[in-house]
From Swiss-Prot:
This is GTPase Era. GTP binds at residues 13-20, 60-64, 122-125. It comes from Lacticaseibacillus paracasei (strain ATCC 334 / BCRC 17002 / CCUG 31169 / CIP 107868 / KCTC 3260 / NRRL B-441). Residues 13-20 are annotated as: G1. It is a peripheral membrane protein. Gene3D superfamilies: 3.30.300.20, P-loop containing nucleotide triphosphate hydrolases. Residues 122-125 are annotated as: G4. The keyword Nucleotide-binding applies. An essential GTPase that binds both GDP and GTP, with rapid nucleotide exchange. Plays a role in 16S rRNA processing and 30S ribosomal subunit biogenesis and possibly also in cell cycle regulation and energy metabolism.
Amino acid sequence: MSEHHSGFVAIIGRPNVGKSTFMNRILGEKIAIMSPKAQTTRNKINGIYTTPDAQIVFVDTPGIHKPKNELDTYMDKAALSTLNQVDAILFMVEADEEKGPGDGYIMRQLAEVKKPVYLIINKIDLVKPDDLLPLIESYQHDYAFAQVFPISATMENNVDELLTALTDALPVGPQYYPEDQLTDHPEYFVVGELIREKILELTRDEVPHAVAVQVERMKDREGGKLQIEAYIIVERDSQKGIIIGRGGQMLKQIGIRARRDIENLLGDKVNLKLWVRVQKNWRDNNAYLKSLGYNTKDLR
């Protein structure tokens, strides 16, 4: 009987390189929200991948970028604080983007960490094979990576090979979570993220970064349905109007799409009620950020 391996693996990189898509593909379920808009992930989100021989807990971190407000500061600290708490690190970049200052900043942070770091070049389906080697060499010039894996998270190219390498590299250890558990976050957190994803999909560019979702209540199932009540938080009355839409149509569409994903995730019929609340400048209000679950003082 082979030894069982287990451990924690951080996924780090600039905003919008495909970290959440990668983790969702591996798990076969949507637990981290995806959007073409940058800075979608705000918290560290743990996804649990289990096989008979291993259990890998992937930590999907917020994209690292120059902070513009207290929320951005929280997101950067959340990502960087993960590095010393895991067994291995996946540094994800895009195959169709040249190495930039943001990548250099991340690699300087990685230089302080005594963990194996794997360079993951995502979206290889968007470039010609001959274009990959110069990109790989440019990254290897600046950092001694444990291994390099060109992958396509959407097409699942080379993902199995990466999982095998990670399994072999992780220490011998127990299975931390039941085999059917996909995340250690509570249901209300994942539900809030799925609602926020639909807002990102449907609203204009001026709204997404100013939006938060607070799930107030998930009641026991009544009449065969799970009752969920949530507030969508925005900073301005104009943003509230955009999210509600003419005759309430935008809010209705957000609810319809979110309910569909929530039902798929939880396996239950859902009655979802949404309201929109204006909280001016909430992204720079530490007390309000804490009430939403963001607390930079907890990050060291």
